[in-house]
Swiss-Prot record:
It comes from the Bacteria. Involved in the regulation of the intracellular balance of NAD and NADP, and is a key enzyme in the biosynthesis of NADP. Catalyzes specifically the phosphorylation on 2'-hydroxyl of the adenosine moiety of NAD to yield NADP. It is found in: Cytoplasm. GO terms for cellular component: cytoplasm. Belongs to the NAD kinase family. Its EC number is 2.7.1.23. Gene3D superfamilies: Probable inorganic polyphosphate/atp-NAD kinase, domain 1 (3.40.50.10330), Probable inorganic polyphosphate/atp-NAD kinase, domain 2 (2.60.200.30). This is NAD kinase.
């Protein structure tokens, strides 16, 4: 019997949350893959990242490996209800292993968000978001110009602004009244957070869908502290000069799953459920 070379093996990382059910599943999966000659368990530069928990766990794993997006693929196991990023439930480990054994490198890829914040002192901070990025002002009302492709669109007054990806459209964006976009649509969505609209101040008041090649700029008009959120991370900065949002050249890729639950089925399951008409 010929032993597989290390370089021939599929490098797999397992990332899980701290819940009891997730820990049990991690131990089971780790034991199986450790004794399988086709796989090599490592968290360093993996080919496949398996997340165990929920969509929040996959968000964390995305940020852990966002510098490896050119070659890494993700696959999620949900230990609760089926999520938007997780294809397997906790009782479907055998199905996952079967699919990994027959895997030929096929993937499903979706756009992500590139965010560049320029501070008043000239420093630039660049991040990537899988779901959304928001900006809020800590003190008083946020006043900011919204610029799309170098064209001044509106002066916003309110609590803040959210820019989401298609996959993130079902998250915070939806709770703000934004539209749900299919993840294969390469576009960004700008949604206002509690905008002021009266006889004096006016904004569009509805979400804006921006195509792939367009860039959104938010230019704050007041000095002070701002809270910037990138998915499940938050940062506080003073005197933000502008923030630019655009679709990143890289994408997130998932292991192609034969029994993949369709996006619209997930939307129905998450927000509508089954009912008798």
């Amino acid at each position: 019997m010929t032993q597989m070379n290390f370089t021939d093996k599929i490098k797999v990382a397992i990332i899980a949350n701290g819940k009891y059910q997730s820990k049990r599943l991690t131990a089971k999966l780790f034991a199986i893959l450790r004794n399988d000659d086709r796989f090599y368990l490592t968290k360093k530069n993996p080919d496949i990242v398996i997340t165990i928990g929920g969509d929040g766990m996959l968000l964390s794993a995305f940020h852990m490996y966002e510098k490896c997006l050119d070659h890494v693929r993700f696959v999620g196991i949900h230990t609760g209800h089926l999520g938007f990023y997780t294809d397997y439930r906790d009782f479907e480990v055998d199905k996952l292993l079967e699919n990994l054994h027959s895997d030929k490198g096929e993937k499903a890829s979706y756009p992500i968000l590139k965010v560049t914040a320029t501070l008043a002192d000239g420093r630039q901070l660049t991040s990537r978001a899988l779901n959304e990025a928001t900006i809020r002002r800590i003190e008083k009302t946020m006043v900011a110009d919204v610029v799309i492709n170098k064209v001044h669109f509106e002066r916003f007054r309110g609590d803040g602004i959210s820019v989401s990806t298609p996959t993130g459209s079902t998250a915070y964006n939806k709770s703000l009244g934004g539209a749900v976009l299919h993840p294969t649509i390469e576009a960004l969505q700008l949604t206002e957070i509690s905008s002021l609209n009266n006889r004096v101040f006016r904004t569009l008041g509805s979400s804006i869908i921006v195509p792939k090649k367009d860039k959104i700029e938010i230019v704050p008009k007041r000095l002070g502290s701002y809270v910037l959120s990138i998915d499940n991370k938050t940062y506080t900065h003073r005197n933000v000069a502008k923030i630019e949002y655009e679709i990143d050249r890289k994408k997130i890729s998932f292991v192609s799953t034969p029994s993949h639950t369709s996006f619209w089925e997930r939307v129905k399951d998450a927000f509508i459920g089954d009912f008798d008409s």
